[in-house]
Amino acid sequence: MNMKLSEIKNGNLSAEWAEKGYELPKFDIEAVKAKTHAEPTWVHFGAGNIFRAFPAAILNDALNTGKYDRGVIVAESFDYEIIDKAYRPYDNMSLLVCLKSTGEIEKKVVASVTESLKADYSFGEDWARLVEIFQNPSLQMISFTITEKGYSVAPADLERGLTPVLAMGKVTALLYERFKAGKLPLTVQSMDNCSHNGDKVKNAVHTYAAKWVEQGLVPAEFLAYVQDETKITFPWSMIDKITPRPDAKVQKMLADDGFEDNYTIVTEKHTFTAPFVNAEETQYLCIEDHYTNGRPPLELGGVLYCSRETVDKIEKMKVCTCLNPLHTAMSIYGCMLGYTLISAEMADEDLRAFIQKIGYIEAMPVVVDPGVLNPYEFIGAVINRRLPNPFMPDAPQRIATDTSQKLAIRFGETIKAYEARGLDKSNLILIPLVLAGYARYLKGIDDNGQAFEPSTDPLLAELQAIVAPLEVKEGEQDFSCLKKLYSRVDVFGVDLYAVGLGEKIESMAKELFAGPGAVRKTLHKYTLAR
């Protein structure tokens, strides 16, 4: 018997699915599809792996409870090949492979996506269907996973009138169709991993609408409509889940099971996709509960609805304390110690102790506690399940990208919080060690004395020029150039000398530069002492 996604629709299922641990939909797929076609409630823009692994899977879980009866319609506005190659041949179904830190995997067929559409005027039928959906009073929410770049507005696109090519322009054009259908209410929901994401969508939509009014293409009432929060809202959200490219190890496991849809697809635009999607087990989606026309009950699948202030606190907890600072510490030292996998770093006793103590001892005293998520449970999941996960092929080199843009929020905010609360900054030892490590990292020489290429960064050449006089060697040398680095408020969020940490960091940097092996020796010394 074939184990193919197309067989599920037919209901002609072999016992092999259950025997091999595949969880199948518990709802009537065709009934949900018909109901959604007639009365759509949710359109999602961005057909990539994160959508299938998270929002679509959450809705699948909600449908499995029997308490909801509508699916989600996916629209792709950038890489149309995804629709042709990863959705339609499989009746819009996919296999979610959940990768656990224990090495176990869970396999679940996701059948909550009822239609897949190419969001562009050149695809006449698809665009007409999107217009029809946006004109339907039943539509409650549109959402996005299109990356932060997807919310950009280009001057040239604003001059294209009502047929723009960028995602936000197309969405604004569809909102105009909804406006013409009777100024119908709708919630416009970003689910991308960037702070205050709702404002990014709002600003883009308002920019297009204002320009079109100025050009005389739409009435002024349209701008008033998208600015009226009784009609259109742009809630904030915090999303957190790692969804890597389709993994060869997972592909082999599925092939060994007899699951036939196990190949990977690379589009002309270099999107890596497949009929299956592999992702980590841990996931968080917290959404500001500000809807104008109702919403799908995604809490049935684990979404946390809360206030805007709480979403902001959750974001700060993650970015300033419980995840991102640990990532950056591991990336700087991982690159210098020759690691290429974050999971491998977690088997290094010095590095594991380093990030544990940064999180629990130094950052946690000033953590922003959102109340609805426990910071200790969150960081515990990061250290014990997420970072050691052997299925997550994340590299310190990837995380080290744009480090100069990240240090202020990931460490500067903690230092500022110590200042604001009058806490003793002499208790900060390992956070200064991270910042001292940054000067050593900028040299591009690893702990064995071999050259490595630091990750791309807009300030890389400028900051490397500051540390250029320094050498990785034993003996005396002039470290006065570091003053120019560690007084950079734009990089660190504070003048580290003004807050009394500059000299401590300089002293640590001197130890890190003291020849091959000095990085390991210094890391071990301070981590053990802490």
What feature does the model see in each segment?
Residues 2-45, 49-530:
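Substrate/ligand-engaging "lid" and interaction regions
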